[in-house]
């Protein structure tokens, strides 16, 4: 067998089946929307700065921001005068974005309440298509088809490089074996198989440390990703937290590095 015999879309889906917590319902993001808006929109970030520089969006270019969240990129892009179509499946995120739109008078910003799985016939094409940290999809081929259908000039995606957003020690502490998320390499290889020779860079981030002050904060972050823990699992997590505190060791959540995948669209 060679790499040409592997269907990376099928292999990706097999990985998803083995990964039982990859697809979070929108209500979970609704509850995090206000906090994310406070922490992300308009705040200095090495990740945001590097991605904006890579995209180099001009004021006369339109952008489709897929998985826009509370407006991390939609707001600054609209503020510079670009037309922005912002798409998210969380009403809570879109509500936060609507407040920024009103606050800053962003008349060139339009929102769409949609997921990757929805019909996108009414979503406009754009010069630049962005999917930042929103590429853990159900169907890799469907995502690629949508990206190619909507992009006029350039596509920019960021995808995970680590299999977990949680500290690896969490899983041992609670006694769970977990295969984790499929990483960027599936997407990169499937793009190649679809005839797209994408560019690959990496973005270093400030992530990687637990952002919270208590065991309750840690429990909340773990249950956000994994669902409700059993009492035995909570005991294991508490012991893990106490040990880290006693040894003054950080709890490393998040992706320390993101894969930036991008390409120019060749429209004949």
UniProtKB/Swiss-Prot annotation:
Gene3D superfamilies: Vaccinia Virus protein VP39. It comes from the Bacteria. InterPro entries: CFA/CMAS, Methyltransf_25, SAM-dependent_MTases_sf. PANTHER family: CYCLOPROPANE-FATTY-ACYL-PHOSPHOLIPID SYNTHASE (PTHR43667), FATTY ACID C-METHYL TRANSFERASE (PTHR43667:SF2). This is Uncharacterized protein HI_1273.
């Amino acid at each position: 067998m060679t790499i040409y015999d592997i269907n990376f879309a099928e292999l990706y889906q097999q990985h998803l089946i083995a990964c039982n917590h990859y697809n979070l319902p929108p209500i979970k993001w609704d509850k995090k929307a206000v906090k994310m808006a406070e922490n992300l929109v308009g705040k200095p970030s090495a990740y945001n700065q590097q991605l904006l520089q890579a995209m180099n969006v001009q004021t006369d270019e339109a952008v489709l921001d897929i998985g826009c969240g509370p407006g991390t990129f939609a707001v600054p892009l609209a503020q510079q005068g670009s037309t922005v179509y912002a798409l998210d499946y969380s009403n809570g995120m879109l509500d936060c974005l609507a407040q920024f739109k009103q606050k800053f008078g962003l008349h060139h910003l339009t929102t769409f309440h949609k997921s990757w799985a929805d019909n996108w016939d009414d979503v406009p094409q754009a010069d630049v298509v962005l999917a930042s940290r929103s590429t853990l999809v159900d169907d890799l081929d469907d995502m690629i088809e949508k990206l190619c259908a909507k992009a006029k000039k350039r596509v920019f995606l960021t995808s995970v490089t680590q299999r977990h957003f949680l500290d690896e020690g969490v899983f041992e502490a609670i006694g769970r074996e977990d295969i984790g998320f499929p990483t960027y390499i599936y997407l990169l290889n499937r793009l190649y198989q679809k005839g797209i020779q994408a560019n690959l860079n990496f973005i270093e981030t400030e992530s990687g440390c637990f952002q919270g002050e208590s065991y309750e904060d840690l429990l909340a972050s773990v249950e956000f990703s994994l669902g409700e823990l059993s009492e035995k699992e909570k005991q294991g997590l508490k012991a893990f937290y106490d040990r880290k505190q006693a040894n003054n060791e950080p709890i490393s959540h998040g992706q320390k590095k993101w894969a930036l995948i991008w390409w120019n669209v060749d429209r004949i």
